[in-house]
């Protein structure tokens, strides 16, 4: 479906069931979940237990929407776990120890930051600035600079191939893209450079850095030494933006490093969270269980 974005006929609609980390289309989300449940449980004799990863800043209303949708799709129990916790578990971090761990998860719609210790979240923040906003920044830049309109999928490719927020000491990269000239309406080919994309992307990333600085200001002094030693764990597809680790290390003075499998860390951690169920329940308020009646 993603490859069809911007390429469909007028009678076909491509829908994002989830946007900014929350449900945007309940009916489509329910049908999607039913399809997934049928794949893992074709007989449908037993209802599954489902763990859903949600942004740290999710509201009670949004949580309830997630729960109701998953339950109506055929789940027996629904568990909600916050993204930074799932990311840490998926990256192999030991969240049960008393030392502080700081996690930055940059997904498609939201960026979540949390300091973890002893199975709990000490302090956290969530901003609606992530991979999708970076793509939008590239689209805006190309439109204002070259008077050419490119699609979201093209912007995403540009971001992955040459997007960067740190060009110091780095070789220039270029990529050729095609779009529609807004004056003539005709196709036009342009060449973009990694150097020219640094500032448009850095403007967006500043919001993440500000949120990270705010979280660090709230962190108890006892955990700061641990965090300085352990560094900052980065997960999510957006965390793979070139130079982001260098920029964060330079601005926040904490060594930032990418997880071994950043794209799948949250998904892996969400699955593994069932192994931590008893431990996470012990005073861990962000892990919630809802059962069908």
Q: Model regions: which residues?
A:
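Nucleotide/phosphate-binding catalytic cleft detector across ATP-hydrolyzing
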Residues: 1-106, 114-232, 239-293
């Amino acid at each position: 479906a993603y490859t069809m974005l911007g390429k469909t006929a007028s009678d076909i609609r491509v829908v994002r069931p989830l946007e900014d980390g929350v449900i945007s289309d309940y009916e489509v989300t329910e049908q999607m979940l039913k399809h997934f449940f049928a794949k893992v449980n074709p007989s449908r004799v037993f209802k599954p237990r489902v763990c859903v990863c949600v942004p740290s800043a999710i509201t009670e209303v949004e949580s309830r929407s997630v729960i109701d949708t998953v339950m109506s799709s055929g789940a027996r129990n629904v568990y909600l776990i916050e993204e930074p916790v799932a990311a840490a578990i998926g990256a192999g971090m030991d969240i049960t120890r008393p030392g502080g761990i700081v996690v930055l998860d940059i997904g498609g719609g939201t960026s979540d930051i949390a300091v973890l210790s002893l199975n709990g979240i000490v302090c956290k923040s969530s901003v609606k600035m992530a991979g999708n906003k970076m793509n939008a920044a590239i689209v805006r830049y190309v439109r204002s600079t070259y008077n050419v309109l490119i699609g979201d999928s093209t912007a995403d490719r540009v971001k992955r191939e040459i997007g960067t927020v740190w060009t110091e000491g780095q070789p220039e990269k270029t990529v050729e893209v095609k779009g529609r000239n807004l004056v003539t309406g005709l196709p036009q080919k342009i060449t973009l450079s990694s150097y020219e994309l640094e500032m448009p992307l850095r403007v967006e990333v500043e919001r993440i850095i500000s949120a990270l600085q705010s979280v660090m200001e709230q962190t108890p002094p006892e955990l700061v030494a641990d965090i300085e030693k352990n560094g900052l764990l980065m997960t999510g597809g957006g965390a793979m933006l070139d130079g982001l680790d260098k920029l964060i290390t330079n601005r926040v003075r904490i060594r930032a490093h990418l997880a071994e499998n950043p794209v799948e860390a949250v998904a892996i951690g969400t699955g593994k969270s069932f192994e931590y169920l008893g431990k996470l329940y012990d005073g861990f308020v962000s892990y919630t269980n809802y059962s069908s009646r």
